[in-house]
């Protein structure tokens, strides 16, 4: 859904999320949560630390927006606050990284801070236009999550483990079917694909 999302702002069509990724983490049973779907405590990865993928300078911080209820339509979400609590890091001229939907009150940086790869920016949450805890990440050509166009990016390396064949079943709490395929294995200098199950540096799925 990200790749085709377009925004008409100030008379200009923009595609800010063309290469965006929503990261979720499955538990050892390959489930998204364990417990009630609407309880944030059921999601073991809720509150996981979010690290900066690059060096750069913090140019935008939003915090204080409430958490949404998982499994339900977002309440009070607008185009202006769709990214929820978030941090934007200027990588270099014309390249900015967005880390969105952070946990309320969790941002660890301020505008003007210089960061290195691995710096903790905040904690994973469910704020803004979100119906389950996740990290929304993309690279864009300006500091605004709205008034920008997406830029392609790649990961240094990741381990492909297959694909989730039924995303709706995963989100609803059912056991997903992980389908191994020819893309399983080590990948370098590539971007992950839709519904692909990957691990980074032995961190798990």
Give the location of each predicted region:
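Zn2+-dependent peptidoglycan hydrolase active-site motif and core
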Residues: 44-45, 55-103
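Non-catalytic extracellular/periplasmic "stalk"
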Residues: 1-43
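A residue-level detector for short acidic-glycine micro-motifs
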Residues: 25, 60, 101-104, 126, ...
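Flexible, gly/ser-rich surface segments that form the specificity/activation loops bordering the active-site cleft
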Residues: 62-78, 119-135, 144
